[in-house]
Amino acid sequence: MAFQAVCILVGVFVCSTYVKGSPQPQARVYLTFDELRETKTSEYFSLSQYPLDYRILLMDEDQDRMYVGSKDHILSLNINNISQEPLSVFWPASAIKVEECKMAGKDPTHGCGNFVRVIQAFNRTHLYVCGSGAFSPVCAYLNRGRRSEDQVFMIDSKCESGKGRCSFNPNVNTVSVMINEELFSGMYIDFMGTDAAIFRSLTKRNAVRTDQHNSKWLSEPMFVDAHVIPDGTDPNDAKVYFFFKEKLTDNSRSTKQIHSMIARICPNDTGGLRSLVNKWTTFLKARLVCSVTDEDGPETHFDELEDVFLLEMDNPRTTLVYGIFTTSSSVFKGSAVCVYHFSDIQTVFNGPFAHKEGPNHQLISYQGRIPYPRPGTCPGGAFTPNMRTTKEFPDDVVTFIRNHPLMYNSIYPVHRRPLIVRIGTDYKYTKIAVDRVNAADGTYNVLFLGTDRGTVQKVVVLPTNSSARSELILEELEVFKNHAPITTMKISSKKQQLYVSSNEGLAQVSLHRCHIYGSACADCCLARDPYCAWDGHSCSRFYPTGKRRSRRQDVRHGNPLTQCRGFNLKAYRNAAEIVQYGVKNNTTFLECAPKSPQASIKWLLQKDKDRRKEVKLNERIIATSQGLLIRSVQDSDQGLYHCIATENSFKQTIAKINFKVLDSEMVAVVTDKWSPWTWASSVRALPFHPKDIMGAFSHSEMQMINQYCKDTRQQHQQGEESQKMRGDYGKLKALINSRKSRNRRNQLPES
């Protein structure tokens, strides 16, 4: 216990040190749900006012369709506009199964329904779909037609058992891929949720699964994703990779730790001949590490893998694997993004195997003889051209795989540290999608990060040197009004659209909305959005061309001074002057909110025609993110205030406020409800407009004025003579005239 306590304290110290050294960045632009809708760059869809647990399970860009699974429904939506009327199939669980589910004590709302979790393209005309079936999984073939114009969408086969293809519990994730009309699934195969398996079904060959109840293979896994990735030029060497997290017991067998893992199998694996019959003989797994390392050495791990995105390149070895990780500690909560080179993953799987002498021993690198062909090699591939099937593998290869499925080395991210870390925030990342964008000054990987509060952050990470990174949150969007956590996310670079789901509905968001950054070249340049550039008239979508000088863009530095010459930068820096009044000894607020929270603010004060001087901040004068708070206003506070914003060394005047101080005694007379004043009706004779004074009043004073005006209107409506409203004009006039020498502009006209 003492050792665990020390580890927890060390972890907290490492994370707090990391946060202290790296302040959490803010989004440069934040759009609420309503503001996002006003940009006309988003669409929203919901089948019902009730939560239906939507999951985007398949994208077909060739037919412009997106297939969504939900509770009792399968949807086909137009990816050009998801708000259009969808094609849908109502596919509930049978009444008998629903009743049995309820009798078993399962949740009637979130468990006893048919939650669709598998949608895979079986062939050109049919989808293969599976649902939880009220804790009795079912599957069927769904006819979608040969073309999207056919408007065909119906289940045209009898339902069959989904056991081994879809989890019983809809709250337990199911992952799957379809290869040559064979389904590869990661799920739980039983009602109680104790038998996890990676399973191949729908096959003309024998069904194959992981070794049952063997914790060396799978230990209470929670599946995250699955992908088919080529391995070299021979198609027989391609492998299916499963990403998951699992609970592993330590040597003391008293506690369980969560580790993120990646496993792989060969699609053409048919199991062993005498051992591992109908079991994978090519199953290997390795640990995925995403951690922060302190200068003194200790690592703080983000243990729980939440989502995976593969950014594919022309060469599969250069594919980038992005992962969302969260902490499992109850002491601190956070999330991180780690990115891995696929070549590093291959290196680990080609490296040493892990070995354990006994239950109380540590893992070591296996030092014995490695059988041939190397365990994990696919039959018929580049290294085993003469072996047509895994049943031809020697017995020692099969035995070795059964006892040594784990690789000794762990897989570390690029530069052995996270790309992005979030600790101490009120949200955690849940989903990720990445787009590769060509800009004027290079190529950037733009990250779209979904959160558990229903927002999407658009982030670009800029390289500064071989190891350091500088991240920019370009924008954060509320894609769901009720802040529902994001459950799935798909991206279409072809359509330049992002598709997001939650328990409540579906959202479609454009990857860019350049016009929101502003109407000036400097605004566009400061945004540093790889999708956007200044075209000489507006901030618009950037398209790489040979004429670079006609498009102004600087993602790496965002410097308007070099990019916006000739676009009247001097005029852009000047803000319109406004007049604001404050009452002596009261509190006032000078508002100045920059467009970007990433800008630093400086306040300058100019009195009469003197030079501008920086405002000295103290307990009385306080700078906030929204402006300058002046407590107990003094005569010396009067003058012209300049609010200067600096971003990327570019300075601009956000606000000019001509601040005038009013005497508290004068304002007291004006607002005395027992001394109503008639001279205020002579607006043209006043040296200032009454509305100007109103801006200086506190909330309580404004309430008094509002009540006075209400009483005045009522008396006028009753036809009373205006003579009864005269009030103590003489007292006010005397008070102001006594201050003529100090400020003659406050003198009222003679009556």
From Swiss-Prot:
Residues carrying sugar: N81, N123, N268, N465, N585, N586
UniProt keyword annotations, A-Z: Developmental protein, Differentiation, Disulfide bond, Glycoprotein, Immunoglobulin domain, Neurogenesis, Secreted, Signal
Disulphide linkage map: C101-C112, C130-C139, C266-C378, C290-C338, C514-C532, C592-C643
Protein's UniProt keywords contain NAD: no
GO terms for MF: chemorepellent activity; neuropilin binding; semaphorin receptor binding
InterPro entries: Ig-like_dom (IPR007110), Ig-like_dom_sf (IPR036179), Ig-like_fold (IPR013783), Ig_I-set (IPR013098), Ig_sub (IPR003599), PSI (IPR016201), Semap_dom (IPR001627), Semap_dom_sf (IPR036352)
Basic and acidic residues bias spans: 712-731
Record function comment: Binds to plexin family members and plays an important role in the regulation of developmental processes. Required for normal cardiovascular development during embryogenesis. Functions as attractant for growing axons, and thereby plays an important role in axon growth and axon guidance.
Region annotation (Disordered) ranges: 712-751
Domain annotation Ig-like C2-type: ranges: 571-655
Name of protein: Semaphorin-3C
Gene Ontology biological-process entries: axon guidance; blood vessel remodeling; cardiac endothelial to mesenchymal transition; cardiac right ventricle morphogenesis; dichotomous subdivision of terminal units involved in salivary gland branching; limb bud formation; negative chemotaxis; neural crest cell migration
Record keyword RNA-binding present: no
GO cellular component terms, semicolon-separated: extracellular space; plasma membrane
Family as reported in the entry's similarity comment: Belongs to the semaphorin family.
Assembly mode: Interacts with PLXND1.
Domain of life: Eukaryota
Domain Sema: 28-511
PANTHER family (alphabetical): SEMAPHORIN, SEMAPHORIN-3C
GN (gene name): SEMA3C
SMART domains, per database record: IG, PSI, Sema
Signal sequence, start to end: 1-21
Compartment list: Secreted
